Amino acid sequence: MLNKDNFDTELADAERIEVLRGPQSTLYGRNTMGGVVNVYTLSPLTYEGVRLTVEYGSGDSYRFRASSYYKLSPDLGMAVTGYFTHTGGFFDNDCTGEKCDWERLGGGRWKTQWRNNRGVRIDNTFSFSALDQGGYPYAYAGEDIVRDGKTVIRNGQISYNDPSSYRRTTVSDGLTVRYDAAKYSVSSITSYQYSDDEMTLDQDFTPESWFTLRQARREHALTEDIVFRSHDGRRYGWLLGAFGFYRHGVMEAPVHFKRTGIEELIVKNANEHLGAIWNEEYSISADELPLYSDFRMPVYGGAVYHESNLRLGRWRLTAGIRFDVEHTSLAYHSRTDMDYFVSKEGGAPAPKRISIDEGNRIAHTYCEVLPKVSLLYAFDEVRNLYISVAKGYKAGGFNTQMFSDILSEKLKWRMAGSQYDEADLMSYEPEYSWNYELGGHFSCMDGAVRGDFAVFYIDVRDQQLTIFPEGQSTGRMMTNAGRTRSVGAEAALQFAPWRSLEINTAYGYTDARFVRYDNGIEDFKDNRIPYAPQHTLSAQAAWTLPTGVKWLGDVVLQAGVRCAGRIWWNEENTLSQPFYALADASVRFEHKHYSLDIWGRNLGGARYDVFYFKSIGNEFVQRGRPRTFGITLNINI
């Protein structure tokens, strides 16, 4: 999945989830810097039947899902899944009196698997989804805004006047063909994805009419990964792969300045900064000013990667390398027309007109070599210690959200007959890291206690960082911080003292700071990196009680807590989310053919924020979901 916007989807009938931390450049086609999450769904060759799910919860939320798994022959199986979810919303927009976070999501999946006795396997998964959302629960996080004695918006208030929404349609197909020979296997993994989305935003998120955005994007993505792999169980194992991808996107992103935005962002700035110099006064009579920006964004790349594994008694040495190349380009077209008036030395206003119609193409090619090495000592099949070193890399890109800022600045300067000296804000450079990790897995009490731990150090150069330029800017941009470092530890423990009781806990600590980053206005050395939680903690206990009633099955009591914080929101470290805890609990009646789950989430009603951003100098945070209750019924036929 090349587009991160498509992560928001339904994981229907997930059988297991595998998480691989850190850079993964020699196992899979697409290079990753932060890790890989593999989701494995039920196979129609190993499971047959019909699965139904019905759920209702707080916020007028409901979910329906139906799956059918069947074999057409011993070697051919198919599965068809359909789903629909609806959320009425939890947060009110005080300006409109309506819920601002409603959502509707529907889609389906068709999975086909075929095997033969000659070592050939074919898997194909076709899926589609359609998403429709309201606006966003963005609460104002600054001092109360008061104009002419009237409060415009208060701290903590969600209140904006212009429509906001998001819709997306996605179609994807993944085909895997694998052949198992006597000593190795070869796989071809081909994927295609089409996405079409449109976002409409009140970008100032206040009751005033500053400016709005409509961003419409269409994208096609094609990937191919060919992997040769030796079979397990040998002293020496190897993997060799070749990967290529092509992605092409087009985007329209017009920004419409409204009356307040025209006066405050264009006219006022022009008069204060340029009018005083030229002894002129500027005015605009229009109530709306559109700034149009169109983009075409083709990206393609390829890689060759290899990994070797050598077993020497209890020792296992793994070494890998990847050669990665990526070409990214941006063709843009920006245009606007503005009528305004200028009066010189108190004279009569004279009408004038500015027309901007310009375009260009920017392109970058990135090449990188990514090595990886690890050493593991196995005490037995479960217990081990390991150390690993890997280089991570993330390609650069373009700041499409800054084009409206650039265009409005050009308007302001051309009002005074001057040219705007355009800064190099359009692109950002790649990010590089070295990841060092020491960890292990352990087990005791005949497997009743299992766990893993890791300590890590990450040295990052040119870290890609989302920032909000100073002043009344209308966009956000990605920039490169000089150098950062992260040091921390993670541990997880599973404890099953009895067959009926299972306890799972996990804790993580991260100290992520700037080592070198100066934006020309302030030095952020030793400040904490935004959006990186200092602590994460989760704990869950499940107790299974047999009822002895055949039609009822077992009763499973579950309780847990999820915690995170502190999370700093900006480079200055002036705003943060303190440590918070979300308590969950459920009672489940579990039978062979059905389960009934009565659950509650965030039982303590914790108030917390999950996102932060700035617009025209104002700070906003996105509210996390409040206390919710619900009931879920699963039926297996």
Q: How would you name each of these model-derived features?
A:
Residues F91-K99, Y136-S159, D204-F211, P254-Y292, ...:
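Solvent-exposed loop segments that connect transmembrane elements
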Residues T176-A181, S185-L201, N384-A390, Q401, ...:
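Membrane-embedded beta-barrel scaffold of Gram-negative outer-membrane proteins
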Residues R229, R235, L239, R311-R314, ...:
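Gram-negative outer-membrane beta-barrel transporters
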Residues A12-E15, T26-N93, E98-G108, G119-V120, ...:
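Outer-membrane beta-barrel translocator/receptor signature
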Residues T46-Y47, E55, S67-D162, S195-W210, ...:
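Periplasmic-side early beta-strands and strand-to-turn transitions of outer-membrane beta-barrels
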Residues M1-R21:
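Short acidic/polar hinge/loop motifs at secondary-structure boundaries
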Residues Y393, R562-N570, R588-I637:
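C-terminal beta-signal and adjacent terminal beta-strands/loops
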